[in-house]
Amino acid sequence: MKYPELFTPISIGKVQMKNRFAMAPMGPLGLADAQGGFNQRGIDYYTERAKGGTGLIITGVTFSDCTVEMQSMPNCPNSTYNPVHFVRTGREMTERIHAYGSKIFLQMSGGFGRVTIPTNLGEFPPVAPSPIPPRWLDKTCRALTVDEIHAIVESFGKGAYNAKRAGFDGVEIHAVHEGYLIDQFAISFFNHRTDEYGGSLENRLRFAREIVEEIKKTCGADFPVALRFSPKSMIKDWREGALPGEEFAEKGRDMEEGLEAAKLLISYGYDALDVDVGSYDSWWWSHPPMYQKKGLYRKYAKAIKEVVDVPVLCAGRMDDSDMAVEAVQTGVCDIVSLGRPLLADPDYVNKLRAGKTADIRPCIGCQEGCMGRIQKYSMINCAVNPQCARERAFAYNPVFRKKKVVIVGGGIAGCETARVLAIRGHEPVIYEASDRLGGALYEAGVPSFKDDDRALIAWYAHTLEKLGVEIHFNHRLTAGELKTLSFDTLIVATGAKAKTFSLGDDRRVITAKDALAQSGENVGKHAVVIGGGMVGCELALWLTKDLGKKVTIVEALPKLLAVNAPICSANSEMLERLVPFYGTDVRCRTTAVKATENGLVIRDLDTGAEESIPADTVILAVGFTPDRELYNAMQECDEVYAIGDCKEFHNVHSAVWDAFEVANHI
């Protein structure tokens, strides 16, 4: 075993885990039924991660209160809404999870308060400790009364008791973290109260103290109660967070207060601290995109571990196995929490234990299948794993007649199609025009912050080789040649072509793909990127941060990232701030007029004024057009499908999901 330290037991209170891996809690939208119980998708979703070897499953957020922070119906499981139903559905899940030797904690929330996503509110106003601005709305929150606080505390006791009856091994309180309701009470920036719940740190933590005391009173002193805890908020101001490496005055909880709070919370009776960093006002810390470094919470977890004597859990892009074992060995944490990596691959832990790290499907940090879908009031899923939270409904369909399927294009959509077809028992054959797999994602993976894109390509290459999929490289199939081949089904995954236009003197004009394909060697010291969408912004960030270029973005719309394929807010808000932070000159409401020998002439769309800016290289990042030529030429085929960017230029999530859907029903 390569990582034995990660497979030793550890206890939270008197509950022993079989290894050092926990499933980090993630919003369980779509996993509850109308009575507040776990639906079949939720039961299958958590059980699959236990089957995959995870020692402790921590559910996503559930509620116990259903009267104070009112919502139109339970959008997440609720342990008091219909107690008998909750116990029945919960017990079905806990019994299945225990069959795999895993433990399970129910994460219980005190409420969202000012950070409630508007689609969850319905007609009800957000609540908070004080009349403060909400995260998303231009309104003022309603301050909770003391009686309402007491009612929420009492509901925790009842809800935890129902969880214990349902077979849960413990609970985790949500949370003195990320700026949720209990955290809003704990942070003076949000809490302006003058009663016993405001003022001193002890008073601001009173809500959290009363919750653990109520649960211990109701469920017994030995019933474990963990706490999700952010020792630092990373808040610059209302709705404005700090970037990595940025100097700023912390308006939320700073580390000094975080360490003091940790000691107090343990003295109140909490049995473990599940550490992260950030808040909804700095969402890219709480839900780190690919622009954040791996293991970004480690130094904060280590600081907490040095002042408490209970187990410390640490999440935050901990899907580097060597980093994880080092964290346990060096006292950074006791337990490694994996959230999105377990969405991407529920068998992560078992594969790691068996030394099959190349088999682990990587999370790419896009957050479009998980946080992005939750924000849109959909359900938690995964961009690279279409079966996530749909394990039963999207199981591989059996094959009754083996088919030979020709796949034109070895990009991500083509690879996913071949993978699913081969697993089901069909005979896929890939024809790829270049000498490698990955399609456009290969160039997209050039920047240092997109390493996981390349990791996904490597995983597909490894997986297709194991499955014995036939691949023809450097073979550009034409319609004429296709008509001479024998096959049952044709899949066209020929991608998309970059849009271009002439700027007059085009000698120094290239596309974003050209720049990435040559690792920036064809880009001069001064570069102008035309287009402020995700491609243009990531290109500018790479050119400045990684290559030290001087970059200007020219964007016709009023802001960066105004038109894109869907992007999770944590990703888009961080990227929008990183671009100028690393020195890019952003020119919105501006258009390119012409390229000259000395640079690029641009025009202000509001004033009409023109100016010339330095440009050794002009890079077009103005979108893509699906390449449907081959698909259109093959319409006489009995069974032909267009997938990926060939169908519609979108993102990895759409490419993988469309490919899975088509391949699973051939």
What are the roles of these predicted feature ranges?
Residues 370-386, 565, 582, 650-653, ...:
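Flexible, Lys/Arg-rich cytosolic regulatory linkers and terminal tails that connect or flank
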Residues 57, 273, 336, 490, ...:
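Receiver (REC) domain switch-region micro-motif
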Residues 399, 403-431, 472-484, 493-566, ...:
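Rossmann-like dinucleotide/flavin-binding elements
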Residues 1-408, 412, 416-428, 436, ...:
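Flavin-dependent oxidoreductase catalytic cores
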Residues 458-497, 593-599:
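Feature captures the FAD/FMN-dependent oxidoreductase FAD-binding
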